[in-house]
Amino acid sequence: MNTQEAIRNIEREKENFPLYESVRDKVVETLSYGQKRLIALMSAIVSGESCIIIDEATDGLDVNNRKILSNAIRKAAKGRIVLVVAHDLTFASQIADCLVFMKDGCLTEIQENSGEPEIEKMYEQLYSEEGGR
């Protein structure tokens, strides 16, 4: 992607990141951990890639930034694949179309998102036998 494409993509996506205007002229080292996480996500989204992988997206984010992140991921998912690794079942239930569970490094269950209560039941069934992950 050239510079002009990057600028167009940033302009198109910045409305999904309310903090953009407040941090755009700051040195990265002065930003909070949560702000850095959101800027990293914005960078991935504006890259134009058809697949984005996000690991533990909510780690270190306050409630407000979690909402911003959820909205941004849902909007970014249109027309692309977004793979989110998460242990936060509430967050997963808010953003996922499909959930994949792993145990001992292997995929054990794939299901459509049927809401947080059903996700919690599946999680308990998979992991309670051995006392956790």
Label for each model-derived stretch:
Residues V27-L31:
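Conserved ABC ATPase signature
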Residues K67-K78:
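Helical segment within the ABC ATPase nucleotide-binding domain
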Residues L41:
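Hydrophobic anchor residue at the start of the ABC signature
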Residues C106-S128:
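Conserved beta-strand-loop-alpha-helix hinge in the C-terminal portion
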Residues I52-D55:
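Catalytic Walker B motif of ABC-type/P-loop ATPase nucleotide-binding domains
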